[in-house]
């Protein structure tokens, strides 16, 4: 398997070009799944307060035998704790649950714009970074206007914006904007599992043309777009397969064919960040 390339974030932190999503990996089975992911070669694990698995992530880190400094560990602040003091306490408690001294990256999970607290939360995380509790501060599901407001009021853009992105929802405008302001795009649900995109005839045909599985084809598409995909799997074989995307490449025509699958109804659920709220 080829070595995993790295991205350098706008704050100088180096991160691998693909990470292991951990949604629904909880408890002792979740620990085993995360350990198998690390053994497969993943060096970045993406968890969240709302996933209820920060403790499992910490246990996996202690069990895996890989030095802490070689890993990039991530969690997220829930929408119900966006006031300054609440954000700080939630972060501190998450570190206690995981048994960690710091998060490599800590993200605001949703902007929840009706509440109007995401800038306050972002400032709290910047201050926590100054205390050494976080190395990099990012966000999820932010629109350009949310990113601009954060920058205007704090003087900084987030290091990453983790958004829904897959062939049926390619988010070209968001990618272009993120590139303009120096924010790395992370892709959640990169395979669009609700839509079963790996079974799309166009994807199946392209995968056969390239000589790879449909999931590897899609994840390679993400990488060549310049994003960081976060495939989630607890299956060791699937984890290894999803990681093996750096030994081949797609032509411009193949990339365009995948992007052309985008649909107006491509979002998997009614979670438009303009109005959607998650607590």
Where are these regions (language model features)?
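Beta/alpha (TIM)-barrel catalytic core signal, keyed to glycine-rich beta->alpha loops juxtaposed to Asp/Glu
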Residues: 111-279
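Acidic (Asp/Glu)-rich catalytic clusters
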Residues: 9-10, 58-69, 92-101, 127-129, ...
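Glycine/small-residue-rich loop that forms an oxyanion/phosphate-binding "nest" at active or ligand-binding sites
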Residues: 80-122
């Amino acid at each position: 398997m080829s070595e995993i390339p790295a991205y350098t974030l706008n704050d100088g932190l180096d991160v691998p070009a693909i990470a292991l999503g951990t949604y629904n990996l909880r408890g002792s089975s979740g620990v085993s799944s995360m350990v198998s992911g690390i053994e497969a070669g993943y060096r970045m694990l993406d968890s969240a307060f709302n996933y209820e698995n920060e403790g499992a992530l910490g246990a996996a880190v202690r069990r895996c035998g890989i030095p802490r400094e070689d890993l990039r560990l991530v969690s997220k602040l829930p929408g119900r704790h966006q006031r300054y003091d609440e954000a700080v306490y939630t972060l501190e408690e998450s570190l206690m649950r995981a048994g960690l001294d710091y998060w490599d990256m800590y993200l605001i999970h949703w902007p929840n714009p009706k509440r109007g607290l995401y800038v306050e939360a972002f400032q709290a995380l910047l201050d926590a970074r100054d205390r050494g509790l976080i190395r990099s501060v990012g966000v999820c599901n932010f629109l350009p206007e949310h990113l601009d407001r954060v920058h205007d009021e704090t003087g900084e853009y987030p290091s990453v914006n983790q958004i829904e992105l897959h062939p049926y929802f390619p988010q070209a405008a968001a990618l272009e904007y993120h590139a303009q302001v120096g924010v790395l795009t992370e892709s959640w649900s990169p395979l669009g599992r609700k839509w079963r995109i790996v079974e799309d005839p166009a994807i199946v045909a392209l995968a056969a043309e390239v000589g790879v599985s449909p999931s590897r084809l899609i994840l390679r598409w993400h990488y060549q777009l310049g994003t960081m995909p976060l495939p989630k799997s607890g299956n060791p074989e699937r984890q290894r397969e999803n990681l093996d995307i750096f030994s081949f490449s797609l032509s411009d025509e193949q990339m365009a064919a995948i992007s052309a699958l985008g649909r107006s109804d491509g979002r998997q659920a009614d979670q438009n960040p303009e109005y959607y709220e998650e607590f």
